[in-house]
Amino acid sequence: MSDMNNPADDNNGAMDDLWAEALSEQKSTSSKSAAETVFQQFGGGDVSGTLQDIDLIMDIPVKLTVELGRTRMTIKELLRLTQGSVVALDGLAGEPLDILINGYLIAQGEVVVVADKYGVRITDIITPSERMRRLSR
């Protein structure tokens, strides 16, 4: 009975041929090594070019927001608000205000008055690691 042809053996041979073909194709397409790829060199370049690149973004407007505090409320509570209603915020009196650029916390500060208008004095710039820590809360 060992002389009988097994259809599964024929399928395995066909699969082996397909794998061999795929491997040879992969070798032929990946013959160019990564070291041969040409990349533009960083550093040691023209510093004035970098300053010109920065000048391109200097006039892009951003939205600066100063947050006094936040709170959560239900729709029912929202609909009950009238003129004179007081909404309690989570920020404490005297606590630094959050300064956001395009919705991202970048600094903290305190309220000041400048020519009869509100202003904010920056008291602390938030480091990138501190921003990540605050976002994970």
Swiss-Prot record:
The Gene Ontology CC terms held by the record are:
bacterial-type flagellum; bacterial-type flagellum basal body, C ring; bacterial-type flagellum rotor complex; plasma membrane
- Report whether Phosphoprotein shows up as a keyword of the record: no
Keywords associated with the record: Bacterial flagellum, Cell inner membrane, Cell membrane, Chemotaxis, Flagellar rotation, Membrane
Q: Which Pfam family, giving just one, matches this sequence? A: FliN_N
Query: Which terms does the record give in the GO molecular function aspect?
Result: cytoskeletal motor activity
The compartments listed are:
Cell inner membrane; Bacterial flagellum basal body
* Single GO biological process annotation from the record: chemotaxis
Q: How does it sit in the membrane?
A: Peripheral membrane protein
Asked if the Swiss-Prot or TrEMBL record annotates the protein with the keyword Cell inner membrane, the reply is yes
Q: NCBIfam families under this entry?
A: fliN (TIGR02480)
Q: What does the record give as the function of this protein?
A: FliN is one of three proteins (FliG, FliN, FliM) that form a switch complex that is proposed to be located at the base of the basal body. This complex interacts with the CheY and CheZ chemotaxis proteins, in addition to contacting components of the motor that determine the direction of flagellar rotation.
Family, per entry: Belongs to the FliN/MopA/SpaO family.
Q: What is this protein called?
A: Flagellar motor switch protein FliN
From what organism does this protein derive? Escherichia coli (strain K12)
Gene name per UniProt: fliN
